[in-house]
Amino acid sequence: MKLPERIFFTGVPGSRWSGIAQTLETMSGMNISDRTPDREYVHHSYTGHKGVYFGPGMEFEPILDSDYIDQAWVEPQGCKLVKSHEWAYNLNQIRTKFPDDWIVMVYRPDMISYAWWHEAGGFAISYPDYRP
């Protein structure tokens, strides 16, 4: 399977989308050069978050510009998993601006997601910064 340059990846907080992201990033051809010790959050026995997350007030805003997005990765080669809760609000723009890239959305029922999000730390997590 030929991977695109980017996969725009989104899910609600608590949907365990970050765990799915980590599984996808084990595939051959994925670029994980966005991972640094500062871009990691561990809770329970999980490394809950790894790599860059795009969002309002975060290190990288959810700006749909290829040069802006790509600067989060050290290496240019390989498929980049571009993670943001905000992509769900911009699906048409993503499809228009990045027609050859993929969009993946993770679904999990709302109350189950809400409960897991709070168990994993909610707004109090260290990375990424979700404080309002």
Locate each region found by the language model.
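PAPS-dependent sulfotransferase catalytic core
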Residues: M1-E75
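PAPS-dependent sulfotransferase catalytic domain
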Residues: K80-P132
